[in-house]
Regions:
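Extended catalytic-interface subdomain
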Residues: 313, 340-361, 371
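C-terminal recognition in membrane/secretory proteostasis and scaffolding
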Residues: 349, 359-626
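Early extracytoplasmic/domain-onset interaction patches
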Residues: 24-69
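Juxtacatalytic substrate-recognition/specificity segment
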Residues: 53, 213-338, 344, 348
Length: 626
C-alpha cells in the first residue's frame, strides 16, 4: 500500500470517529417515562403497518434506534430497509432528523429548548411477496413483531425502558400474545406496560380464524393458539391435543421448573403467511401446513417445531451464551455457544417429539438417521470447516442461498450440535453405568429458580462444570474436539446400540416428504436432489452429479430418452445397478440442452438405523416417555 493511500485511510478513520461515537453506549440506568408504541395494522391490502411512537424528550441531541440485532436470529437482521415515511415531531412541530452514516439504524435529532415529548411516525412496509422477505400480513392473518415497529432511545439497557403498546386490528379479528391486555375498545387493543426488552420478546399473531386450547392449567398455564387460512384447519382431534399437552408435561419432567408466568404457543397453519419458527421467553412463533391437524399422518415431519421452540424458553431465553446476552438490540451479539443454544435444543426437540407422542419412536429414528447420514456422507465441508466456525453464519450469511451448501456448510451448530449431544448422552450413561444421562444435565443446567425469567447467562466453563457434576470426565476436550475438529460426529449412534445403514427403501421421512411434492431425494446415490419439475435443488460436492458437471438450477428434461419424473429417474438408477451402462440425462442449462452421462451403478440409497445385536438399546430409552 503506498503512502498517500495510508494517509488517506488514516484521515478517513479520524474523520469517522466522531460520527461513530455519537451513538451513546447503553447504560444500566432507568429511562424516565414510558415509551408508547401505537400500531395500525388494518391496511391488509397494502400490507402496511402504520406506527406512532411517543417518548419523553429533553432538550439537546437525541438518538433513536431501530432494533438491529434480533434475538433468535442471532444476527443484524432488523429490517431497516422497510422503514419508510419517517416524520419526527417535538411538541407538535416537525423537526429534521439525520441518519448516522456509520450506523444506519441510528437517527439523530436535536430536541429544541423547552420540549418535553417526541413523536416519531413511520410506516413498516412489510413484504408483499417472498422475494422481498417473509410475508407478515395476509387477508386472513398477520404477525406483528414489535421490533419492526419500534424506535427507542439510545443510551439505555432495553430492560430499563418502560414501554406500552397498542394495536388496531382488522374488524373482528382475534389475537394472541404473551403480553397482558389492559383493555380492548372496538378493534384497538392496549396492553399493560412492560419492559421494552420483553415487549420485543412478545410478538402477536392475529387473524380471522382462531382457536385457543389450554394445554396446562395452574399458576403458570400454557396455551396453544392456532390461526389458519381456513376454519377447517382448526379441527383438532382430542388425541392430537393430548400429544401437545404431553409435550408440556415431558418438559416439566425434564427441567422441573418453568421460567415464565404463562406460555403461549402461536401457531399459524397457512400457505400464505411466511414460514417461521422463532423462540421467545413466554411464547413462540410457529407455522405449519394447513393439514397439520386434518392430515395428521402426512404432516408429522414438521411437528418437532413446537418442541424445539418450547425448549428455547429454557435454553436460549432464560439461559443463553454470555456473548448473546446484550444490553439492547443494537449491540452486536456473539454466537460462540450456539451449539448448546441451538444444538441441544435441536436434540431435545426431536427427543421430546418422541416422548410426547407427537412422533413415534420409528419416526424419530428415521429423522435421526437422516441427520447422521448428513455427517457421514452429506457434509463434505467438514473437511475444511468446523461446527464452531459455522456459529459465525448468522452474521456472515444470514441464510442467503448458497451454491454448494453441503460444502460451504450453513449453521451446522444445529444438527452437528445435535449429534454431539447424542454422543454426550451415551458417554454420560457409560460413565455412570446407565444411572445418569443428559436428562440430569438438563435439569442441573436449566431447571433452577422456578418462576424466574430474568436472563441467566452461561459460559463454556459453566457447561463443562455442570457436565462434570453429572459425571467426571475431560468434558472440555470432548466438546472442543467435536466442535473444533473435522472428525466424525456420529459416535452417539453406535454407542446407543444402533448403526447407520443404507438401502434402496426410502425411510419414513423421505417417503412423507416425497409423497407431498413428488420431489426426489437422491443425495446418497446420484448426489443430488430434484424437484418434481426436474429442477436440481441441491448437488453434493464431489458426488456423481457434481463430477458430471451438474449444478443447482439445471433442469433434467429426460432420463434415458424418457420424459423426466421422479419415478423415471429412480427406475433408471435401479436399472443401472450392477451394470456398466451410464445413466443418460438430457439437461437444460440456461438456453442450452446438453446430454450428460453419469457413470453410477450403486442403486438407490437411503439412510436407516439398524439395531446392533447384543448391545443395549439406549436410544429407545432416550425416546421413552418419562
Amino acid at each position: 500500500m503506498n503512502v498517500p493511500t495510508v494517509l488517506s485511510l488514516s484521515l478517513l478513520a479520524a474523520l469517522s470517529l466522531p460520527a461513530a461515537a455519537q451513538t451513546a453506549a447503553p447504560q444500566d440506568v432507568p429511562f424516565e417515562g414510558t415509551l408508547k408504541i401505537d400500531v395500525d395494522a388494518t391496511d391488509l391490502q397494502h400490507r402496511i403497518f402504520k406506527v406512532k411512537t411517543t417518548m419523553p424528550a429533553t432538550p439537546g441531541p437525541m438518538t433513536l434506534l431501530y432494533p438491529q440485532w434480533i434475538p433468535g436470529n442471532h444476527s443484524p437482521t432488523g429490517p431497516i430497509d422497510k422503514l419508510a415515511g419517517l416524520v419526527i415531531k417535538v411538541d407538535g412541530k416537525v423537526v429534521p432528523w439525520t441518519r448516522d452514516q456509520f450506523d444506519v439504524y441510528a437517527f439523530k435529532v436535536d430536541v429544541p429548548q423547552g420540549a418535553s415529548e417526541l413523536v416519531a411516525e413511520f410506516k413498516f412496509l412489510s413484504p408483499q411477496a417472498s422475494s422481498q422477505g417473509r410475508v407478515m400480513m395476509t387477508p386472513e392473518m398477520l404477525n406483528l413483531q414489535w421490533n419492526t415497529t419500534a424506535l427507542y432511545p439510545a443510551g439505555y439497557f432495553a430492560r430499563n425502558i418502560k414501554a406500552q403498546a397498542s394495536v388496531t386490528l382488522p374488524a373482528g379479528w382475534s389475537y394472541a400474545t404473551a403480553m397482558e391486555t389492559e383493555r380492548r375498545v372496538g378493534d384497538t387493543v392496549t396492553f399493560k406496560p412492560i419492559d421494552f426488552d420483553d415487549l420485543v420478546d412478545s410478538p402477536m399473531f392475529a387473524g380471522k380464524y382462531y382457536k385457543r386450547v389450554e394445554l396446562s392449567a395452574g399458576k403458570q398455564p400454557v396455551y396453544l393458539n392456532v390461526f389458519a387460512d381456513e376454519a377447517k384447519s382448526l379441527d383438532a382431534k382430542p388425541e392430537q391435543i393430548k400429544a401437545h399437552a404431553a409435550l408440556v408435561q415431558q418438559m416439566d419432567k425434564l427441567y422441573g421448573a418453568r421460567h415464565f408466568d404463562h406460555y403461549e404457543f402461536l401457531l399459524a397453519l397457512t400457505k400464505k403467511l411466511g414460514g417461521i419458527g422463532l423462540e421467545h421467553h413466554r411464547s413462540s412463533e410457529n407455522s405449519g401446513a394447513p393439514n397439520y391437524f386434518t392430515e395428521w399422518d402426512k404432516s408429522w415431519t414438521g411437528r418437532d417445531l413446537l418442541a424445539h421452540e418450547f425448549n428455547h424458553s429454557w435454553n436460549g431465553k432464560y439461559r443463553r451464551g454470555a456473548d448473546l446476552a446484550t444490553p439492547n438490540f443494537n449491540v452486536p451479539m456473539g454466537d460462540s455457544l450456539l451449539w448448546l443454544y441451538e444444538g441441544q435444543t435441536q436434540f431435545w426437540g426431536e427427543v421430546m417429539s418422541a416422548r410426547s407422542g407427537l412422533w413415534t419412536q420409528e419416526q424419530a429414528r428415521d429423522m435421526l438417521a437422516g441427520v447422521a447420514a448428513q455427517y457421514e456422507r452429506g457434509r463434505p465441508g467438514m473437511a475444511w470447516r468446523t461446527v464452531q466456525d459455522t456459529t459465525n453464519d448468522p452474521t456472515m450469511s444470514m441464510r442467503r442461498p448458497k451454491a454448494y451448501r453441503n460444502y460451504q456448510m450453513s449453521e451446522d451448530y444445529y444438527s452437528g450440535g445435535q449429534m454431539m449431544w447424542l454422543e454426550v448422552d451415551s458417554k454420560l450413561r457409560a460413565l455412570t453405568n446407565n444411572k445418569r444421562s443428559i436428562d440430569d444435565f438438563g435439569k442441573a443446567f436449566f431447571g433452577m429458580k422456578n418462576g424466574e425469567w430474568d436472563v441467566n447467562p452461561y459460559t463454556f466453563d459453566d457447561i463443562v462444570s455442570t457436565l462434570n457434576g453429572v459425571a467426571a470426565f475431560d468434558w472440555a476436550s470432548f466438546l472442543r474436539s467435536r466442535m473444533d475438529g473435522h472428525g466424525s460426529l456420529i459416535g452417539g449412534i453406535e454407542a446407543n446400540g444402533w448403526k447407520l445403514v443404507y438401502n434402496d427403501e426410502p425411510n419414513l421421512a423421505t417417503k412423507t416428504d416425497e409423497s407431498d411434492d413428488k420431489d426426489a431425494s437422491l443425495t446418497y446415490s446420484l448426489g443430488m436432489s430434484l424437484k418434481a419439475s426436474g429442477d436440481i435443488s441441491d448437488v453434493l460436492w464431489d458426488g456423481p452429479a457434481f463430477n458430471a458437471g451438474l449444478i443447482t438450477g439445471n433442469t433434467i428434461v429426460a432420463v434415458n430418452g424418457r420424459a423426466f419424473s421422479s419415478d423415471v429417474i429412480k427406475d433408471a438408477i435401479t436399472a443401472a445397478k450392477g451394470t456398466t451402462v451410464p445413466i443418460e440425462l438430457l439437461v437444460k442449462r440456461l438456453d442450452r440442452y446438453d446430454t450428460v452421462r453419469i457413470d453410477y451403478h450403486g442403486g438407490l440409497l437411503y439412510p436407516h438405523l439398524e439395531r446392533i445385536a447384543g448391545k443395549p438399546d439406549r436410544l429407545s430409552e432416550l425416546y421413552k416417555a418419562r
